[in-house]
Amino acid sequence: MLNALYPLFRPALFSMDAEDAHHFTLNNLLRAHRMGLGSCIGNRIAEDPHTVMGVRFPNPVGLAAGLDKDGAYIDGLAALGFGFIEVGTVTPRAQPGNPRPRMFRLPQADALINRMGFNNGGVDAFVANVRASRWKAEGGVLGLNIGKNADTPIERANDDYLYCLERVYPHASYVTVNISSPNTKNLRQLQGASELDSLLSSLKDAQQRLADQHKRYVPLALKIAPDLDADQIGNIGDALVRHKIDGVIATNTTISREAVKGLPHAEEAGGLSGRPVFEASTRVVRALRGVVGDAVPVIGVGGIFGGADARAKIEAGASLVQLYSGLIYRGPALVRECAAALRG
């Protein structure tokens, strides 16, 4: 039902402040789920299992991190038919993020700009929300996305990632390490060769220790930016293989404004997502696959607005795909369309 109604609701949602509409939608989605209306709002999607990173995904279409930063809406989002859901980014301590307004629509380009700044309630509250999720308890595939606090010096970033990994590890199907948001000062420096080597080495040591402690291996994925040249992609790919990282998510938002020049809000600071990032993110997927071969699976995200876009990510070398901005513009019908395009 929601698939048919969303195009009617969208003008009202788009008349609201973007962040207010975001929370309004999530709150009502969760409320409908709790009222037992899941069959009315949900997508029933046929099983199309994919095993990636050693994890069995019921279908290859997931929700990207950022929509549910605190893991508070997992059960409502699960009704939309995703094969997996990624929540976060979470940091060790609660932080408010950047001042509002910090999210902007560019409807002429099917795009969003955000400078949220990892606003979240901290990792302890995050874990409590994850533990309360019925969908997770019933075996849903849940990725937990971790980052660093804004006031943590970049030289001590590893400490924040290790702190979060320690706490989320027992509750995750996989853990994503976000080093590519443009909205935390200097964060993308961690994509540099020496910084990345240090971080990945520390994380792999911790992963092995935690696997021994919990008697369960939880894969690690790295989320990278689209604004990378061939040498940078090569260096990152080599590091992923060398450190035996389990997966890579390509990509985060872009700082480029080339595709939206002259549009309202185009010069707002932050990361641009949506249709304009499709080509850049797909280029990174293809280039990464060329570097890592079959050693590291790629999850493709960025600008997926239809089944053909999802298929293009897979053809470029992705094993799974994730949605975010396309979901805002197209609604939950996009999940079903992408799953159908990738089936078989």
Curated annotation (Swiss-Prot):
PANTHER family, sorted: DIHYDROOROTATE DEHYDROGENASE (QUINONE), MITOCHONDRIAL, DIHYDROOROTATE DEHYDROGENASE (QUINONE), MITOCHONDRIAL-RELATED
Sorted alphabetically, the keyword list is:
Cell membrane, Flavoprotein, FMN, Membrane, Oxidoreductase, Pyrimidine biosynthesis
EC number, as in UniProt: 1.3.5.2
UniProt cross-references to SUPFAM superfamilies, sorted A to Z = FMN-linked oxidoreductases
- Name the gene that codes for it: pyrD
Tell me the protein's name: Dihydroorotate dehydrogenase (quinone)
Pathway the protein acts in:
Pyrimidine metabolism; UMP biosynthesis via de novo pathway; orotate from (S)-dihydroorotate (quinone route): step 1/1
- Reported cofactor(s): FMN
Concerning NCBIfam families, the annotation shows: PRK05286.1-1 (NF003644), PRK05286.1-2 (NF003645), PRK05286.1-4 (NF003646), PRK05286.2-5 (NF003652), pyrD_sub2 (TIGR01036)
Binding sites annotated in the UniProt record for FMN: 65-69, 89, 145, 178, 223, 251, 274, 303, 324-325
Task: List residues traversing the bilayer.
Answer: none
What residues does substrate bind to? 69, 114-118, 178, 183, 252-253
Query: What GO molecular function annotation could you give as one example from this UniProt entry?
Result: dihydroorotate dehydrogenase (quinone) activity
How does it associate, per the subunit comment?
Monomer.
Describe cofactor binding as the record notes it: Binds 1 FMN per subunit.
Chain's role: Catalyzes the conversion of dihydroorotate to orotate with quinone as electron acceptor.
- Give the matching HAMAP family: DHO_dh_type2 (MF_00225)
GO BP annotations, alphabetical order = 'de novo' pyrimidine nucleobase biosynthetic process; 'de novo' UMP biosynthetic process
Q: What is the phylogenetic placement of the source species in the record?
A: Bacteria, Pseudomonadati, Pseudomonadota, Betaproteobacteria, Burkholderiales
Q: What is its main location?
A: membrane
Localization, per the record, is: Cell membrane
Catalysed reaction(s) here are: (S)-dihydroorotate + a quinone = orotate + a quinol
